[in-house]
Design a protein with these regions (language model features):
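C-terminal motif of bacterial Sec signal peptides marking the signal peptidase cleavage site
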Residues: 16-19
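Bacterial signal peptide processing site
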Residues: 21-23
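Extended, low-polarity segments enriched in aliphatic/aromatic residues
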Residues: 34-330
Length: 330
């Protein structure tokens, strides 16, 4: 049974736009009786199970089709990382006949080289349930960024062009540099090759990972570059994509961290949409409106990195909408 919970009618209606490091303020919601067709829908289910992952995907009404369906996940840096559990996602990946897709990292670690990256994916159980494609194993290619300020193009794994349909299956959590990571980060940094990751992190200054840390821009330029890379991917795939966020193990740290901080707040659930901006916005709203103080660390991480700026900028350049109808599935 589906029941409409609420519609977010403005970008500020639910999430307080606190200054960096600021505290969350009281928020309000506006109830509606029926969803508005022009506003994207975000589907939500609280219990995080393999059956419910399938259920929330089916609610989207868009079937993953084609000979090559890519399921974009993060394979996780180490066994301590909070990457998505294979028991949770196995049935869903089989349902869509998907192949896990990833790209190498731009920093030293277990996933900076293809051979070690495959080994890490194997250790984390992913190769046992579906093929894994490290998309920049054979190099990279570019896709255009329309209307960008920092990037004229995005640098993605060469194999990305082989896929007919994109399933963006993200673990929503905090992030050391972006404040939070969800669908937008997964399609920007996540689909970028190692060189592409350097390109985004430096706001177009260098594609050489060896030069990344010496060329970091001011924070908003990095955040905006992530949004621009996400736009390139969204424009490329068009309507052949779905976006799902699993909001569990809500650490302040990303799955790219080999020794992440333990989660403080409780799991939120599974959310899905055809709009990645609306999806990430709904997840952020749930964090800011969580009913107890266990949310504080994650909110401080988001605010201290000006993390919500990616939502504002992504909406501005046409990636998606921060307005959404939230529908719960029971």
């Amino acid at each position: 049974m589906k029941k409409l919970l609420f519609s977010l009618l403005s970008a500020a209606a639910l999430v307080p736009m606190a200054s960096c490091g600021g505290k969350a303020e009281a928020s309000t919601t506006t109830a509606v009786e029926e969803p508005t067709d022009s506003i994207p829908t975000v589907y939500y289910i609280k219990d995080i199970t393999s059956e419910n992952l399938v259920k929330v995907y089916e609610a989207l009404g868009r079937k993953a089709e084609g000979n090559n369906v890519g399921v974009k996940i993060s394979t996780g840096e180490s066994m301590k990382s909070h990457h998505l559990d294979t028991g949770l996602i196995k049935d869903f990946v089989h349902l869509v006949n998907g192949k896990f897709i990833e790209c190498n990292t731009a920093y030293n670690g277990n996933r900076s080289q293809t051979e070690q990256h495959y080994k890490t994916a194997q250790e984390h159980g992913y190769t046992a349930i579906a093929p894994v494609d490290i998309m920049d194993a054979d190099g990279d290619t570019t896709i255009v960024v329309n209307g960008g300020t920092h990037l004229a193009y995005d640098i993605v794994g060469k194999h990305f062009l082989d896929y007919d349909f994109l399933v963006v299956l993200s673990h929503f959590k905090g992030h050391a540099m972006g404040g939070f990571g969800g669908a937008l980060k997964n399609i920007s940094i996540g689909i970028a090759s190692a060189d592409g990751k350097s390109w985004i992190h430096t706001a177009g200054k260098t594609r050489n990972p060896a030069e990344l840390w010496q060329n970091l821009p001011e924070q908003d330029a990095f955040i905006e570059s992530m949004a621009e890379a996400a736009k390139a991917v969204v424009d490329h795939v068009g309507g052949k994509a779905v976006y799902i966020n699993v909001a569990n193990n809500l650490s302040v740290d990303c799955d790219c961290d080999g020794n992440p901080a333990p989660p403080k707040m409780a799991d939120l659930g599974i959310l899905a949409s055809l709009d990645p901006v609306a999806l990430d916005k709904a997840c952020v709203d749930m964090v800011f409106n969580f009913p107890d103080s266990t949310k504080t660390n994650l909110i401080e991480r988001i605010n201290s990195r000006h993390g919500t700026h990616i939502l504002d900028y992504a909406e501005k350049i046409g990636v998606g909408s921060q307005k959404y109808n939230l529908v719960t599935i029971e």
